[in-house]
């Protein structure tokens, strides 16, 4: 395990790390706090596979991998996966689960900025899902992801839009009414409008290729992808060719 001790460590919110450390042991409980992540993971994975043209035998980095839900599923698709996170306990859980399931992948405790300094233009695909709204400087993360991916490579981001509807759905609804995630999981002030995210992307060699919303219907208890990006959304970007 490698631990980052560089100045880029400053782009870490210790309170956010502590929140996820406290519940890390239940990361792979399909009925626990991370049930929504397990439910949406097939949608995320299918989107990544379709937009990137497949990831078999490709080098893939999952930034903010947590306990490894997405990272492990990408490794099972035949990718050479590295999971990156600053939470010690989630990474321990991820390593143990990979060992139990016989899934081959690597986990590193390091900031994405530090990793980018060491591995520029190394990965074919970079994913950064449900992470940007948990760091002090999301633009710095986007710049690092752009640095990490090869020319013509793919970078995927997902986060939550910032508006009244997203606050009602992602905070009031998900945390307090439906109790899908623990109270305090999200800070609505840290949500990111698509225009902001794409603005940061445009300041890098990345170019936006596609954007799609992730929708939850509480009546049918069903998740699906769609064009509306009012709440959760994913963005597919691609680095300019050399």
Curated annotation (Swiss-Prot):
> Which residue positions does the secretion signal occupy?
none
Gene Ontology biological process: methylation
Keywords, comma-separated and alphabetical: Methyltransferase, S-adenosyl-L-methionine, Transferase, Ubiquinone biosynthesis
Q: What is its EC number?
A: 2.1.1.222, 2.1.1.64
According to UniProt, this protein's pathway is:
Cofactor biosynthesis; ubiquinone biosynthesis
Class of this enzyme: transferase
Q: Which GO terms describe its molecular function?
A: 2-polyprenyl-6-hydroxyphenol methylase activity; 3-demethylubiquinol 3-O-methyltransferase activity; polyprenyldihydroxybenzoate methyltransferase activity
List of residues binding S-adenosyl-L-methionine: 44, 64, 85, 129
Known function:
O-methyltransferase that catalyzes the 2 O-methylation steps in the ubiquinone biosynthetic pathway.
Assigned protein family = Belongs to the methyltransferase superfamily. UbiG/COQ3 family.
Q: What protein name is recorded for this chain?
A: Ubiquinone biosynthesis O-methyltransferase
What species is this protein from? Yersinia enterocolitica serotype O:8 / biotype 1B (strain NCTC 13174 / 8081)
Q: What is the lineage of its organism?
A: Bacteria, Pseudomonadati, Pseudomonadota, Gammaproteobacteria, Enterobacterales
Originating gene: ubiG
